[in-house]
């Protein structure tokens, strides 16, 4: 089934609410809406994080040092296995997240 998703129109009822787009052989593709930070976490798989609308400050740890990068619409952040990170939206943001199904 084909889909067209206008990501800038998606709004969830709560921060980090998601629209499940598809699951491709155990890889989930979800569109998230948020206006609040997530929490520091480490995924048990790789994660691709694409800002579809808005701006997101991504904080992550590399070699024991906390680093920060400001992502704008169209920017992509890749978190490898074991990368501790947290996303802080700057106002409302819509983020496409691609990761292993049930990743934590």
Over which residues does each language-model region extend?
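A cytosolic small-molecule/anion-sensing beta-strand core signal
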Residues: 25, 52-53, 72-73, 91
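Conserved short histidine dyad/triad with adjacent acidic residue
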Residues: 27-43
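His/acidic/aromatic-lined binding-pocket segments of jelly-roll/cupin-type domains
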Residues: 39-42, 46-51, 68-69, 87
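Ligand-binding loop in jelly-roll beta-barrel domains
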Residues: 81-104
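Short acidic-glycine-tyrosine-enriched beta hairpin
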Residues: 63-81
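Structural motif
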Residues: 28, 48, 55-57, 84, ...
